[in-house]
Swiss-Prot record:
Function of the molecule: Catalyzes the conversion of dihydroorotate to orotate with NAD(+) as electron acceptor.
Binding-site list for substrate: 45, 69-73, 127, 192-193
GO terms classed as biological process: 'de novo' pyrimidine nucleobase biosynthetic process; 'de novo' UMP biosynthetic process
Lineage: Bacteria, Bacillati, Bacillota, Bacilli, Bacillales
Catalytic activity field: (S)-dihydroorotate + NAD(+) = orotate + NADH + H(+)
Single annotated GO MF: dihydroorotate dehydrogenase (NAD+) activity
Gene from which this protein is expressed: pyrD
Subunit structure: Heterotetramer of 2 PyrK and 2 PyrD type B subunits.
Active site: 130
Signal sequence, start to end: none
Protein's name according to its UniProt entry: Dihydroorotate dehydrogenase B (NAD(+)), catalytic subunit
GO cellular component, one term: cytoplasm
C-alpha cells in the first residue's frame, strides 16, 4: 500500500507534494537536481494567452521569514507553453496542473479552452489572486460574484477539473470559497501571497519597482493554516494547501487543518531538493505520529472538536 497516495478530481497523486506555480518554472531547472517522477504533480508557471514580460526590476526583496516578489506573471505565452514546455514534461509520469491567468474573463476562457486539451494536463488552477498585476489577478479573487462568474465561465469550456487559487487579501475568505464552490469548482488551492512592502533605509522609497509585492515563505504559514482550517469546514471540495511549507511537519499541519494535498513554493528557491526530501521523510513522520495513511491526518484539528461535542 502506498501510504502517501492521494486521489483528487482529475489527479491521481503518488504523494501529496506538488511544487507551487511560480516557484518551479516548468521544471527544467529542477530536473537537473532530481528525477521529477518522485513528485505528486507539478503546478506549472502561470500561462497567459500572449507572452508577458512582467514588472520592471527590482522584482524580489528578502524579508525576515520569507520574500516579497512582484514578478508580474512573466511567461512565454500559451503558444510556447503548449508547443514546447508541456511536450517536454510528457517524459515524466506526472499529472500536470496548468495555472491559468489573464487580464479579463475572456483571457481565462481562451487559455483554459486550449490548454485543457493538452494530453498531460489533468487539471487547471485559476490564478484569480496574483497581487502583482494591475489588471486581472487579484481583482477577480476579492469579490465573490466576480470569482464565481469566472469559475463558471471556465468550467463551461475546460475539459479537465478546475481548481481556483484563493487570495488571502480579503476580509472573508469563506464567503469567496463558498461562492466558487457553488459555481462548480472542483477544488481550491490556498493561499496565494499576502500583499506587502519594504522600504529602503537610505532613500525611504519602496525597494520593489512595483512598490508592493506578494509575501511568501514561512512568515505566512500561520495565516495559511488558519484560512485552510476555516474554509475546509464549510466546503465539500478538496483543498490543496500552501503557504510557507518547508518540511514534512509543515505538510502534516496543513493536513490537520483540512488540506488534501499541499504545494511547496518559496522553499524551492532555498533548497532545490526540498520536495524530494519532504517526500522521503513523510512515512517516518506518519509512523512517529501513529498514522497508517496520510489521509488519516486530513481535517483532524476540527474533526476531533466536532466529535467531542
Amino acid at each position: 500500500m502506498n501510504r502517501l497516495q492521494v486521489e483528487l478530481p482529475g489527479l491521481s497523486l503518488k504523494n501529496p507534494i506538488i511544487p507551487a506555480s511560480g516557484c518551479f518554472g516548468f521544471g527544467r531547472e529542477y530536473a537537473q537536481f532530481y528525477d521529477l517522477n518522485v513528485l505528486g504533480s507539478i503546478m506549472i508557471k502561470a500561462t497567459t494567452e500572449q507572452p508577458r514580460y512582467g514588472n520592471p526590476t527590482p522584482r524580489v526583496a528578502e524579508t525576515p521569514g520569507g520574500m516579497l516578489n512582484a514578478i508580474g506573471l512573466q511567461n512565454p505565452g500559451l503558444e510556447k507553453v503548449m508547443g514546447s514546455e508541456l511536450p517536454w514534461l510528457e517524459q515524466f509520469d506526472l499529472p500536470i496542473i496548468a495555472n491559468v491567468a489573464g487580464s479579463q474573463v475572456e483571457d481565462y476562457v481562451a487559455v483554459a479552452k486550449k490548454i485543457s486539451k493538452a494530453p498531460n494536463v489533468h487539471a487547471l488552477e485559476l490564478n484569480i489572486s496574483c497581487p502583482n498585476v494591475k489588471t486581472g489577478g487579484i481583482a477577480f479573487g476579492t469579490n465573490p460574484e466576480i470569482a464565481a462568474d469566472l469559475t463558471k465561465r471556465v468550467k463551461e469550456v475546460s475539459e479537465v477539473p478546475v481548481y481556483v487559487k484563493l487570495s488571502p487579501n480579503v476580509t472573508n475568505i469563506v464567503e469567496i470559497a463558498k461562492a466558487i464552490e457553488n459555481a462548480g469548482a472542483d477544488g481550491l488551492t490556498m493561499i496565494n501571497t499576502l500583499l506587502g512592502m519594504r522600504l529602503d533605509l537610505k532613500t525611504a522609497k519602496p525597494i520593489l519597482a512595483n512598490r508592493t509585492g506578494g509575501l511568501s515563505g514561512p512568515a505566512i504559514k500561520p495565516v495559511a493554516i488558519r484560512m485552510v482550517h476555516e474554509v475546509s469546514q464549510v466546503v465539500d471540495i478538496p483543498i490543496i494547501g500552501m503557504g510557507g511549507i518547508e518540511s514534512a511537519e509543515d505538510v502534516i499541519e496543513f493536513f490537520y487543518a483540512g488540506a488534501s494535498a499541499v504545494a511547496v513554493g518559496t522553499a524551492n528557491f532555498v533548497d532545490p531538493l526540498v520536495c524530494p526530501t519532504i517526500i522521503e521523510e513523510l512515512p517516518s513522520l506518519l509512523d512517529e505520529l501513529g498514522f497508517g495513511h496520510i489521509s488519516e491526518c486530513q481535517g483532524r484539528s476540527w474533526k476531533q472538536v466536532c466529535q467531542s461535542r
